[in-house]
């Protein structure tokens, strides 16, 4: 079954090309920013939550919180869109595999790799906490 968002153009600018992640609250797509000629990630709130004021509030708060952060271990927010029909966050696209995929490929993580990843995650969390954001 074809995802209804594939091929969709948001704000006349972001052309969705591929589904890359499925979450509980939103799905994440790879897209082309045709104005800036770059690949981006677009997080779209699932339609079943589009009329739920609590989910809308949380989604908007997430975009505001991330937008103020500037850290190498945190994706950058480029744009947001909140209309009656769709709510989305446009973010930096990071090419590669997820930490989960890396761990599945490696089997048991080497302790040095585990420490490396934990340090990177903690640095990002510390940066957010320093700015009053709790994850």
Across the structure, where does each feature detected by a protein language model lie?
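Activation-segment/catalytic-loop signature of the eukaryotic protein kinase fold
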Residues: 80
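AlphaC helix of the eukaryotic protein kinase fold
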Residues: 46-68
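Protein kinase glycine-rich loop
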Residues: 16-23, 28
């Amino acid at each position: 079954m074809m995802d209804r968002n594939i091929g969709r153009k948001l704000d006349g600018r972001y052309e969705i090309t591929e589904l890359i992640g499925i979450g509980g609250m939103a799905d994440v797509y790879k897209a082309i920013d045709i104005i800036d000629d770059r690949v981006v990630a677009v997080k779209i709130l699932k339609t079943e939550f589009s009329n739920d004021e609590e989910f809308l509030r949380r989604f908007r708060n997430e975009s505001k919180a991330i937008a103020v952060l500037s850290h190498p271990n945190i994706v950058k927010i480029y744009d947001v869109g909140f209309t009656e029909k769709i709510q989305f966050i446009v973010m930096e696209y990071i090419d590669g595999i997820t930490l989960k995929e890396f761990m599945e490929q490696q089997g048991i993580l080497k302790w040095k790799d585990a420490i490396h990843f934990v340090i990177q995650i903690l640095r990002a969390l510390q940066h957010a906490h320093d700015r009053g954001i709790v994850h």
